[in-house]
UniProtKB/Swiss-Prot annotation:
Cofactor note: Binds 1 zinc ion per subunit.
This protein's name: Formamidopyrimidine-DNA glycosylase
Keywords linked to the UniProt accession: DNA damage, DNA repair, DNA-binding, Glycosidase, Hydrolase, Lyase, Metal-binding, Multifunctional enzyme, Zinc, Zinc-finger
SMART domains cross-referenced by the UniProt entry: Fapy_DNA_glyco, H2TH
Source domain of life: Bacteria
Similarity field: Belongs to the FPG family.
GO biological process terms on file: base-excision repair
Subunit structure and binding partners: Monomer.
HAMAP family (alphabetical): Fapy_DNA_glycosyl
Organism from which the protein derives: Geobacillus kaustophilus (strain HTA426)
EC number of this enzyme: 3.2.2.23, 4.2.99.18
GO terms for MF: 8-oxo-7,8-dihydroguanine DNA N-glycosylase activity; class I DNA-(apurinic or apyrimidinic site) endonuclease activity; damaged DNA binding; zinc ion binding
Length: 274
């Protein structure tokens, strides 16, 4: 699943390809992707005639800003966007097509059909699901060691489960939680409430640093992720633990182990993390 760095990279590469373009038609081939309004015809009708004014990101969600409305898109596991000429044939697994007046199209493909789309009036979008439930952005001042500590002391969950909770901090998934915990020297299965104030500060610092570095490197391509221009990310070459089961730790040489924490495959170094 694309996490914050991958979605941010998609946002940056997609924005110049669609900004200023006016929607002439919307074709929907898999209605289950449409979540609000549930009626696909109503979903399409309200966007026709509107111009793309911007593209933002909130956590793992893309937020397309139109004249009056905002389209909220979650890519889930395999969703991706591409811009192509209307004359080019559709690729397999294309489920939604936004046709522009200039003859180009924004095409949404999703092999697994898990993605979702919501349309709301712009002024309502942040107050409605799915955005309303999200916690602070990790690179914003709203996410501080104090905020993290407050949530940690109130839960019986593991620290990994806490960081995967999108109401705590928006945009972290399996890759960047594992990497942040390794860099902070904290075992993923530790109770979040057991972390000391120094560990909380170190974890916060490494979360911010890890996400920031991953954004600069265009995200991680560990399976199928590519940006809007078909380019792979580069942060996978900087991964310390994720996807490296059995390989030597880059810091101490101990083989990286894999277990299950919070229902997710979890990579860690049994020597570097406590």
């Amino acid at each position: 699943m694309p996490e914050l760095p991958e979605v941010e990279t998609i946002r940056r590469t997609l924005l110049p390809l669609i900004v200023g373009k006016t929607i002439e038609d919307v074709r929907i081939f898999w209605p289950n992707i449409i979540r609000h309004p549930r009626d696909p015809e109503a979903f399409a009708a309200r966007m026709i005639g509107q111009t793309v004014r911007g593209l933002e990101r909130r956590g793992k969600f893309l937020k397309f800003l139109l004249d009056r409305d905002a389209l909220i898109s979650h890519l889930r596991m395999e969703g991706r966007y591409a811009v192509a000429s209307a004359l080019e044939p559709l690729e397999p697994h294309t489920h939604v097509v936004f046709c522009f007046t200039d003859g180009s199209e924004l095409r949404y493909r999703d092999v697994r059909k898990f993605g979702t789309m919501h349309v709301y009036a712009k002024e309502e979008a942040d107050r409605r699901p799915p955005l309303a439930e999200l916690g602070p952005e990790p690179l914003s001042p709203a996410f501080s060691p104090a905020v993290l500590a407050e949530r940690a002391v109130k839960t019986k969950r593991s620290v990994k489960a806490l960081l995967l909770d999108q109401t705590v901090v928006a945009g972290f998934g399996n890759i960047y939680v594992d990497e942040s915990l390794f860099r902070a020297g904290i075992l993923p299965g530790r109770p979040a409430a057991s972390l000391s104030s120094k560990e909380i500060e170190r974890l916060h610092e490494e979360m911010v640093a890890t996400i920031g570095e991953a954004v600069m490197k265009g995200g991680s391509t560990v399976r199928t992720y590519v940006n809007t221009q078909g380019e792979a990310g580069a942060f996978q070459h900087s991964l310390f633990v994720y996807g490296r089961k059995g390989e030597p730790c880059k810091r101490c040489g101990t083989p990286i182990e894999k277990t299950v924490v919070a229902g997710r495959g979890t990579h860690y170094c049994p020597r570097c993390q406590r």
